[in-house]
């Protein structure tokens, strides 16, 4: 009789649970927007920065572009019909010289990265699997960027 009880425990019970909800891509699209914004902001800030700061900002921009690419891939994988947001390129457009604004200060980049790290960290805590790992990695990278790579005396408050 013990074997029969174990056999029953091992068999699937289809009516006991509902399938998990399909993952929403909206949250990832928000992360994609943040990644693109951070990349553009770091690129713009690099224009007027001294050499060590310039190099760090260019690296931050490249990392955030990689995040945007990874998010775009994940959105396309999750979405049945990918939206136009997930098909956009991650290359920022270059403004004309007459319309160019002064480069943003380093503190703006740090603030933006901090907000992006916090957002990705919160979303990672409510996610699972690959998505949680991707978001956790993005949060860690943004945190390292503003606490280590861009630690040139910029105030982030």
Residues covered by each model-derived region:
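All-alpha RGS (Regulator of G-protein Signaling) helical domain and cognate RGS-like helical scaffolds
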Residues: 2-157
């Amino acid at each position: 009789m013990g074997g029969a009880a174990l056999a029953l425990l091992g068999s699937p019970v289809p009516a006991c649970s509902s399938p998990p909800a399909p993952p929403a891509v909206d949250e990832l699209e928000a992360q994609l927007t943040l990644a693109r914004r951070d990349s553009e902001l770091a690129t713009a800030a690099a224009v007027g920065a001294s050499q060590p700061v310039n190099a760090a900002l260019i690296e931050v921009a490249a990392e955030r572009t990689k995040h945007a690419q990874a998010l775009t891939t994940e959105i396309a994988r999750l979405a049945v019909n990918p939206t136009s947001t997930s098909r956009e390129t991650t290359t920022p457009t270059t403004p004309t010289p007459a319309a160019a604004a002064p480069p943003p200060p380093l503190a703006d980049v740090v603030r933006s990265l901090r907000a992006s790290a916090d957002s990705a960290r919160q979303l990672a805590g409510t996610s699972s699997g690959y998505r949680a790992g991707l978001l956790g990695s993005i949060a860690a990278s943004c945190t390292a960027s503003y606490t280590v790579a861009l630690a040139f005396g910029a105030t982030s408050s």
